[in-house]
Every structure is written in C-alpha cells, then in structure tokens.
C-alpha cells in the first residue's frame, strides 16, 4: 500500500543531500536548556494502579517551569488490553479471535484521564502506539486496526502535527509534531509497532525534507540483551542493540517477543532494519527512543538487575558496533520499567527525563518515580524514587552532526552486519572523521588477514576468505594517527 504524507508545511520536491541536511540540522548553542519526559510502557497503570499514571502527569505539571518541559512522549503500550474494534462513538463494531481483557474500556478511560491532566496544563503529550494498543492485540497475525487508539487519543494531535495517511485518506498511527524551541525547530516522529515498509519509506521522505533535528520514536527498536549469536558474552549489561533481524537473511536470532512472533498484518520492520533503512541513514536524526523490552524476566527490584528494561547505545563504550562505526551516530535510548516489580507493582511508576542543553551540547537523563516519592507505603520497602545507577542516570554528548565532538571511525560498508556470505566474499570499508589515518587491517575471528597502508578505504576488489562454515567475527580496524590509537568496526557473518 502506498502512503501519502499530509504535511502542514511545504515539502520540497527535491531531497536534501546529506551535506545539506548536516549543515542545516544545527541546534543553536544560544537556545535554552529544555526537557522531554518519557512515559515508558504505562500498560499496567490501570484499575487499582491508575493513580500511578496520574502521579506521573501531576509531577510533570509541577516540574514544567523548573525543567522547562516541552513535551511528554509515550513510548507505546499506553494500555494493556487493546479492545474490540469500535466506531467513532466508541461502540463495539467487531470481534476478536482472542477476547481482550474485560477492563479494556476502563483502561483507555483511565489513560485518557491521566493525559488530560497534561493537556489541561498546556503540556504536549505524544502517544506512540504499542502492540498492546491495537484492537484485538492478542490475535495472531496481529491486526493493524487502531480504532480505540484513535477514539480515545486521536484528538491529541494538535497543529502543527500531521499524520501519515494511507491511499484511502485514512490516518494511520504514524505522525509527527514540529516544535520550535528557542530558535531551533525539532520534529518528533512517532512510528507504529514494527513499522510497515511503506511507513518507513514515508518516514524517510519526511526526514529527508526536514532541515532540523529529528527525534524518532517507535515502540520496539532496541533490546538490551545483545540479541545475537555472540553478543551476550561481549556486551555490558544495559548496552542496547537493535532488536532482532530486519534485513533479508540475517543470522541474528530473534527474541521470542519479536516481529516473527507477532506477524503483524502488512509486514513490518524491526531493529536492524530500522537502523539500516531509517535511523542510521540520516545526519539529522538526533535521537531514537523505544520501549517494549523488559529483560531479564520480571521480578522484585532487589532481585532483578538495575538495568531491567533499560539500555542505551553509548559509542564511547561500544564504538566497534554497527551503530557506532557509521557516519551518523544518533543518541539511542531504551526505556521500559514494566518488568520491575511483582504484579501489582509492575513498573513502579518510573519515568525518564531527558534534558537537552544546546549550550553544553549534551543530553542528560535521570529516572524517577513520583509515586514512590509521594506514596512510599504503597511499594515494597527499599525501592528508591530516584534511580542513581549508571544505567538510569547518564549523559550523552550531541552527535557530531549537531556540533558534538567528532572522532575517527571505521565503517564496514559491505556486507551488512548479520549477513549470509560465501566462503570467499568481497568486503568494503572506509575511514570517516577528522583525523589522518594510517594503515587498515582485516581480522577474522581475531586472526589478522591483511594490512593496507596509507589508505582511507579498503582497495576495490578486496576479498576475505573464511576458515569454514558457521558464524564468524569480521573486523576492520584503522590506525588514527592523530589520536595514536586503533578504531575498528565489527560485523558477524555466516557461511554455509
């Protein structure tokens, strides 16, 4: 299905070039600091826990002046029960293979009541759709029908907000908000759960035709378990990586909670695919935000690591990964606290505040529960209102495309990370960044396979021979003569 873009600003017919995007995506250093608040996976804040959602909203209102809060972004799974399809008046007009929870209407009403607190105080709320927010959410293949989402939340998108519409002119749960903060214009772009290829195409057009920073939000993008054949042993707890596989023939094993398990109608695009096709393809993508993943499995706070349901792509730590050894390195954050606490306490009411400082060129995060602070007796003893560990309180520098520090990187441009390849296959890589480079080296499973001197890229026609069948770690590293250090890029490939 082809998608049409309803835009409230004039879209140029010509795409920006990468250099033009980079040049015009700047955030003015004279702009004031401001904050965006994330509400991750609020799905369990219903029935007797509905006060938690309201506590979050009331806290945001109380802190709006001090933190200069400009928006609240829901990361999806606003409710837990989906619901039967409804008409514009909320009357049930369809059935589901699997009946939704009997409280589904109450859940929507309670969520909207909490959101109304924000609206009544002039705080913008952007409701990204999650898998639990679709009609008949438990059916497989999962429907794309979102009548309840639009009935209860569809009037939140006040101008200048625009939806991506389908070829029949119907709006889809994919939309963007243009916000001017200081002298800079930002786009907050919310995309559906595992976006369909045509939605990704429409999003690419939007980003390409927008000259400012873009914050991409989608419910399922990052995972924090290093979901790949070898990553679990080499990635630190709390490190994020794109969820499952999104490009053809990828070798990465998916979590059970994946695109393959939901089989959404119309297909979809998950983590690796979103990185290659959208998030990593534009210099003006400033941040990518997601929820959905709650690993390890749920349990009470003292018994579950602090990184449950959280993670981030920190290129100062994991510079060798595909997400860091690329020309563009947007800030990427996973936030999902629903797995912390036994049933009745899931989530503990944690929200996340991102403070953007244009003058310092940093984004600082902290994680806080207004409910624990206000009602400690409602929660198990020892649960902190502020999460002060490094997984939940951290600072990013701006990406270099927005004036942050630039550095030398090595980028393997072919084959893609996770590809199936023949025993002997061509490889290409390039050095990117501000520094002079010396030689390049290729390694397979830790064994050096070649040296190339005084080059900024591997010579055309360079091939790698693998030692046998199976999964192999292929690395290309470049010597940064200015910093006097090696920088590398790593991919995993498999051969028959």
Regions of interest found by a model, annotated:
Residues 344-407:
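A short C-terminal boundary segment appended to hydrolase-like catalytic domains
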Residues 38-40, 70-77, 125-130, 191, ...:
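Active-site neighborhood of phospho(di)ester-bond hydrolases with catalytic His/Asp-centered motifs
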Residues 253-358:
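Conserved beta-sheet core of the metallophosphoesterase superfamily
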Residues 84-201, 209, 243, 253, ...:
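Extended active-site neighborhood of metal-dependent phosphoesterases/phosphodiesterases
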Residues 90-104, 209-286:
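Active-site-proximal segments of metal-dependent phosphoesterases and phosphodiesterases across multiple
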Residues 23-103:
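N-terminal active-site segment of His-dependent metallophosphoesterases
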Residues 45-47, 80-82, 129-138, 172-173, ...:
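Active-site environment of divalent metal-dependent phosphoester hydrolases
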Residues 405-496:
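Long, low-complexity serine/threonine/glycine- and acidic-rich segments characteristic of extracellular
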């Amino acid at each position: 299905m082809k998608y049409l873009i309803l835009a409230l600003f004039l879209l140029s017919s010509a795409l920006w070039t990468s250099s033009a995007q980079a040049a015009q995506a700047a955030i003015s250093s004279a702009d004031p600091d401001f904050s965006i608040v994330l509400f991750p996976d609020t799905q369990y804040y219903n029935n007797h826990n509905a006060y938690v959602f309201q506590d979050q909203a009331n806290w945001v209102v109380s802190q709006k002046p001090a933190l200069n809060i400009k928006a609240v972004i829901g990361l999806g799974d606003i409710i837990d029960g989906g619901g039967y399809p409804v008409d514009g008046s909320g009357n049930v007009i369809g059935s589901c293979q699997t009946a939704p929870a009997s409280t589904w209407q109450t859940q929507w009403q309670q969520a909207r009541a909490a959101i109304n607190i924000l609206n009544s105080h002039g705080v913008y709320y952007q409701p990204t759709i999650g898998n639990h927010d679709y009609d008949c959410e438990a059916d497989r293949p999962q429907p794309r029908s979102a009548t309840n989402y639009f009935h209860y939340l569809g009037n939140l998108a006040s101008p200048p907000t625009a939806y991506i519409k389908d070829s029949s002119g119907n709006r889809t749960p994919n939309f963007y908000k243009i916000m001017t903060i200081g002298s800079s214009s930002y786009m907050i772009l919310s995309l559906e759960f595992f976006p369909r290829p045509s939605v990704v195409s429409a999003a690419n057009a939007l980003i390409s035709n927008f000259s400012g920073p873009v914050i991409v939000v989608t419910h399922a993008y990052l995972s924090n378990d290093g979901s790949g054949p070898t990553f679990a042993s080499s990635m630190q707890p709390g490190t994020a990586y794109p969820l499952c596989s999104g490009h053809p023939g990828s070798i990465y094993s998916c979590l059970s909670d994946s695109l393959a398990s939901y089989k959404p109608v119309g297909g979809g695009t998950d983590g690796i695919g979103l990185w290659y096709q959208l998030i990593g393809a534009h210099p003006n993508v400033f941040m990518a935000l997601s929820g959905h993943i709650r690993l390890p499995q749920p349990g009470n706070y003292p018994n579950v690591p602090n990184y449950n349901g959280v993670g981030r792509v920190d290129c100062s730590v994991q510079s060798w990964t595909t997400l860091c050894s690329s020309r563009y390195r947007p800030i990427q954050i996973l936030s999902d606290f629903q797995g912390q606490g036994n049933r009745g306490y899931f989530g503990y009411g944690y929200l996340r505040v991102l403070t953007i400082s244009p003058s310092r060129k940093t984004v600082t995060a902290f994680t806080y529960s207004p409910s624990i602070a206000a009602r400690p007796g409602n929660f198990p003893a020892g649960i902190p209102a502020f999460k002060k560990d490094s997984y939940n309180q951290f600072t990013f520098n701006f990406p270099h495309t927005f004036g942050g520090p630039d550095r030398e990187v090595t980028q393997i441009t072919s084959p893609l990370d996770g590809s199936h390849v023949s025993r002997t296959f061509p490889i290409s890589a390039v050095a990117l960044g501000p520094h002079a480079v010396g030689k390049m080296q290729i390694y397979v499973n830790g064994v050096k396979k070649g040296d190339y001197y005084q080059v900024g890229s591997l010579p055309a026609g360079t091939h790698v021979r693998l030692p046998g069948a199976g999964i192999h770690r292929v690395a290309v590293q470049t010597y940064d003569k200015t910093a006097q250090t090696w920088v590398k890029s790593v991919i995993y490939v498999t051969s028959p």
